[in-house]
A protein has these predicted regions:
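Short, small/polar residue-rich loop motifs at catalytic or cofactor-binding pockets
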Residues: 218-220
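Oxyanion-binding "anion nests"
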Residues: 80, 93-99, 110-136
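Generic structural signal for hydrophobic
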Residues: 9-10, 77, 98, 118, ...
Length: 233
């Protein structure tokens, strides 16, 4: 079980982040069962009967274990000394619960309502770089560019396309008319949200982690990499 798995780790393991994910059908990212049906049946080739069985079994597991697993994950994050993140919050109520748990940043809030509530609670909003580049969510949720337009986006995640991160930061710089602010979504903002106080900006006494980037049309090409002040690439 999740509780047993978490129990294998301790503060000495250096766990930095615990993310509270719940992919139960019918809520959060998968609140629209028709979209979930198309996704699951298309990816796994399930029949309608198999899909309905999948939904019912996942919902039954959530009913039986969801609350205790969530409580255990929050408690273990505190024991580890890890930063807590929420995941796919959809409603103001879910964000409020995340805030009470002590979440410092929200991974991929799925609605404007959730992002606005994050702002009210002082929770950093993180969205996926692929979402920004493609102009929308592959799951039909809120678009990163729309949250950026409403000043509700703080951090970019590479998500499932690591190479998208730099290009997306430059795109945000263009959208906001502020390149340093765009770059901050992949440097200082995530460093602050995750408690990495020794990095994220160029300042005396901090790590000298630097990349030199050339802009080619809408893409970013890395031309040099320094870690701790030493060139490694």
């Amino acid at each position: 079980t999740l509780i047993a798995e978490l129990g294998k780790f301790g503060p000495e393991d250096g766990i930095g982040i615990v993310s509270l994910m719940d992919h139960t059908p019918g809520q959060r990212q998968f609140r629209n069962l028709d979209q979930l049906r198309n996704y699951v049946r298309g990816k796994h080739g399930l029949s309608e009967e198999e899909f309905l069985h999948h939904v019912a079994s996942q919902q039954a597991l959530s009913d039986r274990l969801g609350a205790q697993h969530e409580a255990a994950a929050v408690a273990e994050a505190r024991r580890f000394g890890a930063v807590l993140a929420s995941h796919d919050d959809t409603t103001a109520g879910q964000v409020a619960t995340s805030a009470r748990h002590g979440a410092t940043f929200a991974e991929f809030p799925t609605t404007v309502e959730a992002a606005q509530e994050c702002r009210a609670w002082g929770i950093y909003v993180m969205m996926g770089a692929p979402n920004l580049i493609r102009g929308g969510s592959h799951s039909g949720n809120v678009a990163a560019k729309d949250l950026a337009q409403m000043d509700l986006l703080d951090i970019l995640s590479s998500d499932y396309v690591p190479s998208a991160l730099l290009s997306a930061a430059l795109m945000l710089g263009d959208q906001w008319g502020d390149l340093p602010r765009g770059v901050a979504t992949v440097t200082s903002a995530p460093a602050k949200a995750t408690g990495l106080v020794d990095r994220g900006q160029l300042a005396l006494g901090l790590r000298a982690d630097v990349i030199r980037v050339a802009r080619l049309a809408q893409a970013a090409a890395v031309r040099g990499v320094w870690v701790g002040g030493r060139r490694v690439g």
